[in-house]
Amino acid sequence: MSSDEASSEALAQEDIKQITLRIKLPACISNEEDLEVPSLLSETLADIRETLNLSAATQNLTNFNVFYQDINLSENFDDLVPLNDILTELGVGEIDSLNLVLKEKPYNLAAIYDHLNKFREVIGLHFLDKYSSEVGVLSGVSKFGDIDLQDVKETEPETQDDKDKETDETKSTKEDSNQTEEKKSEIVFTAEEKQQIGKITDELISGNTPSLVEFGTFDNISGSIKTPIKSLTVSQWSPVPSFQKLKGDLLYITLQTLENETLNITCHLSGFFVNKSSTINFNPAIKMNENGKVHKDYLLINLVDSLSPSFSKTIQENELVLSRSSKHPESFLIPSNSLMSSPWIVNPSKFANQPDASRSQLPLISNGVDGSGFVKEWNEDFQAIRELPNSTINERILREKLLMKSLHEFNKVATETAMNVIKGNLTPLNPNEPKDYHIYLRNGIFYSLGVNATGAFDCTGGNEAARYTSSKDLAAIKLLNRIDAKGIYNLVTCIVDYMGQRVICQAPVPGILDSSHEDENEEEPTDKVCYGLSTDGSKIFSDSSFENVLKPIAEAFHLKPHPVTLLDNVKSQGDLITSKDIKGVKGTDERKYIIDLYRATPLDIEFIESNWDESKETSYPHRETALRHEAVEEWWKRKVSVLFKAETERLEKEGKLESKDGEKPQIVLPSDQITINTDAFTTIDESSDDQNEVREVSKFIKEHLIEEFLEENSKQISPFDGNHLTSMLHKQGINLRYLGHIAEQACVRKDEHLKKITEARKVNEEEISKRKEESEKKATEGKDQDKEEEKANDNEKNKEDDKEEVSNGEFEPIVANFDSLYRISVQEMVARSVKHLLRKISADIPVYLIPAFVSHFHNCLLGSEINSSPECIIDETLKGFYNATELEFTKLNSNKVIALVANEVLIRFRYELPTDWISTLIRPFQLFREIAIKYGIQWKSQEYAFTNEEFEKVKDKLAVETQVFEAKTSKHKKNKKQQSQLITKSVDRTTIFVTDDIVNFVPIVKDSTYRSSLVDEIFETARAQIFKGETETGINLLNNLLSVYEQIYGRVHPETSKFYGLLSQYYAELGLKSEACNIARKACILAERTTGFDSYESITAYINSAFFESTNDDYINALNLYNKAINDWTLVYGDGHPSSVNTYANLAELLSEHKLFQQANKLFEKAISISTKLNGEESQICGMLRYRYGGTLLGGGDFKSALDQFKSANDIFTKFIGPDDQLSKKSLSFVTNISTYLAYNEHQKSEQKKALAQQASASNGKVKAKSAVEQQLKSSKKGKKNDATQPNPEIASKSVDDILQYIEGKNPKKQLKKKSNNKKSKK
């Protein structure tokens, strides 16, 4: 059993006793009763403190000791010791409850700082702190609150007994089963509900998406919060003078209440009190009011409450606002372990900067009494956490939680500092070197720009290669963090891309930057590398102490030990376990570190040989094109599978697989049997076998992975946007440099499919023509054998009815999917090329001119129809600071920019765009969004017009205010001088974008945060329990896993969001419908806040949530959620995504099941309309839609319209899948039976008219006429023949349901099945 399985099994079997903690609270807390807290014996004192910190009763108590009887647990035991160990040491036996006492501790300055921070959090100032410190505007917002949703309908969960009972019922007759199903699913809607459904349906089909202003408006929950005080600052009288320190004074603070009263407060070791100091006089003595009363309390919040009548009232109002604004705390909770997503479009007026004098003092009270909290040894912190014990589940949870917290704090600090590096706010360590080579060391983090500063990539692409390898290094670090190999350490790393520049942030190896220990007599400095290629490339080290610790890494990356030979007789002493470029370094902390991991996967040699040639202008930018780890892993798995199969067959032949003692022998393959040399094609004297293996993996991308991706894409969901496509490709191990090849192949495959359809249609039309001729021939030969043939046909039909009905049609939108893939691929190539151009051109542009440059570039690219030579307007107050070279970008025009983009696409993606690509292949708005997300631009939410017609409509509303200097002559006659005066003018727009439209630039952060292996193990255990039928145990494990996710990642995190989505699916499958809906709603909120309000993850979360609401029989909520998803979908993709057809059709069937035929018909017509544009009028998917629509029309009693749909469907089916296909026959049957029924109806109406006419005539002649029935009987007796279709007595006087059964062939309705390889999308 593997360690993973063992830990999972331990989790499943672990039974930890729960006890109740009865906690007596100190006198400063006005709570007469003891606090009861459920706890596990496995929890630590730190966990108990955390629980108390979250409890409403004790959240303000920050400085206390925990006592058991007279024993101070806080002083006698470490905070990380489990409660079980404490009780054992104290000699306490098995108990169900434990009595503890909390006692106040005397404050010190550090405790005062902690208390002030907690006070700010409790009163709500941390919300303002969060918004003011975010690098983006309105980061982490959601739009979920804008949707008009009712509470989730509570339903009884389906038990296994219910499912068994349902299974038994299905064994009865089909008629009974259908009746039962109809009764069970029948829902009665009120008139108001029907009106709501109709309104939402009309919105769904209207195609009118909300304006961009509405899209840029988000839930503003935190903005509704009022501050219960005006300010709380460190007083001007701080720090405490020496003569007051001995009296217990620790800090002086100044409070301004909502009543405009300013008070000076002393923070004393015994608590807080108002002193006699004023703005100009210092008097630290306690203040007494006119009644002889003093204001003093151990808790600051109690003191402020006694001083300000409005204080508690405002806090209560804020709590009410939060509860009313959202029923889900996830929408406003501040994340603990994750950077939030910043929307690409925002309304800056919604972001008001609240005054708070204490905000600028936060670094003082948040980083310790001497500022030491700000200076962190990030590497030591991270590695020390990694070395914590992890033998039990609880130890692993604690360890993972601390690792995630450490990584997040590192990312946050590194990002903020990197932005200051790019803005030029910091002094480099090497100021005399060129700007690109500057390096920085700040707060334990080393910063360098992503350039070829060391010269390592001089021959393989220079700066482009250096930039690329930095991201490959990070990808390998991320994987190593997950592998968690013992004895070897990697660096904490993140990459920050901001305003076109890349900064690599790493916690350095201890001692690597320290040159003080080097021998002064040595001519050259000692190389710190112990394993791998030296820094200058002159020597290869192979310290034997690294060999054992590197083996787990080599195994994870499937690396082959190999000798290395370079030029100038640089050789390795024996085999290297890893690549020569991966370096092993010993730190001064005696740990072994591994750095420069960009060569963890081999080169894509096939791509290099085809596309890299430095002598050509159109060469790929660099030679460091590495394969993705996912591709290598997939190649390795398939090779192992082949070997395993061969070994199994060999052992079977030898009879060695026979079971012994009921157990089958295990087949174990050596882990090093399939390995790869990642140094292949980078050295000399290489093994041909090594090169062949690398070439094989390189070919594997095009020959297998891309082919499989194209096949899957043709029949599954096409990507929504560029990020979705990127994610899909990366998961399958395909590098984005293949986007051009994918675009080409999408067109090729589309043409092949159309050709296949044309050929099939030709064959079917010939068959139809042949049958028609045979039918006519038979008609002329006579009808003697008609009855026998009809009888034979009936028998054959009955036999076919008894068989399972399977259609050979292809009902996936294959053509539309390939068109969609092609368009998204081209859009992604263009967007990424624009990002690189913005980066390269802006390298020489000063930071404060970047907004002007970016807006001008957008005008040239997207505004050519409006102004092909747009003027770039620079603020007059800035022009004087910059030279002509720095303003060179203002000479760009549309033709130049479009040509630059096309050339960049060719260089980076090996794809040649057609000359008219900007007008024929690109949707301007969607490209505008993609560029914003990739470069990190936040645009003002307003209407952006990309055509002349649209621009004329909006330009007056978007007049530009600009400041210009205007000459003004002095009025004095003696001194007539020209003076320049700065005035503000409002001028009409001549371009789509202006500089002020850019609200902010946000950094794009790539970090080394990884997915915990522990959560995967627990999830697999839960899934196994459910699969075995232990549903309750499985659900309990899933619920526990949710708690684990929240502990490790925090409640607001992308991984937590994904798990909420997964958990809702499992709940729905297990019949827990209400729970599924509630969890799915949280998934929507978290996806919006962490991945973006319009990301593909958010849209998918909304669609899933809508689906779960519909399964819970709450169709109004479901339609509202679908409406939100489709609006965002249209914004992201544009009109007509292939999968939207199925979404509309499924919604239509959903409504038709509940007799809402009018709304269902509208949705079907919308689906058919979109499908016609995407797939063509005569396509199999349109035929299937019309077939389904016909069924809905039948259900609503609209037989004539149904007949039209079935006729169209039959025509399509016979042409494309042949007249013998089940769908062709079924649709023909519908056509025949409906025609017969309609003819009978017409005959009935005609007879009734005749009868009425005769009756009227007889009445006039005073002669009694026979009734219509009598007339029919009479004519029948006389044996007269009627040319009209004869009435069928079987369908006379039948109910609508019976008529439908007759039309369907008098057989119980069967569900038509497609080919088994056609999967039905949930959409």
UniProtKB/Swiss-Prot annotation:
Coarse class of the primary localization is cytoplasm
Q: InterPro entries attached here?
A: CLU-central (IPR033646), CLU_dom (IPR025697), CLU_N (IPR028275), CLU_prot (IPR027523), GSKIP_dom_sf (IPR023231), TPR-like_helical_dom_sf (IPR011990)
What are the subcellular locations of this protein?
Cytoplasm
- Leader sequence residues: none
List the keywords (alphabetical): Cytoplasm, Repeat, TPR repeat
Superkingdom of this protein's organism: Eukaryota
Which segments show compositional bias classed as Basic and acidic residues? Answer: 150-186, 764-801
Q: What residue stretches are annotated with the Clu domain?
A: 351-608
Chain intervals for the UniProt region annotation (Disordered):
149-186, 764-808, 1250-1323
UniProt TPR repeat ranges: 103-141, 530-563, 1042-1076, 1099-1132, 1141-1174, 1183-1216
**Alphabetically, which GO biological process terms does the record hold?**
intracellular distribution of mitochondria; mitochondrion organization
Q: Where is the composition biased (Basic residues)?
A: 1308-1323
Gene Ontology MF terms in the entry? mRNA binding
Question: Quaternary form?
Answer: May associate with the eukaryotic translation initiation factor 3 (eIF-3) complex.
Q: What does this protein do?
A: mRNA-binding protein involved in proper cytoplasmic distribution of mitochondria.
Q: Which family does it belong to?
A: Belongs to the CLU family.
Name of this chain's protein? Clustered mitochondria protein homolog
Which species expresses this protein natively?
Debaryomyces hansenii (strain ATCC 36239 / CBS 767 / BCRC 21394 / JCM 1990 / NBRC 0083 / IGC 2968) (Yeast)
What does the organism's lineage look like at the top?
Eukaryota, Fungi, Dikarya, Ascomycota, Saccharomycotina
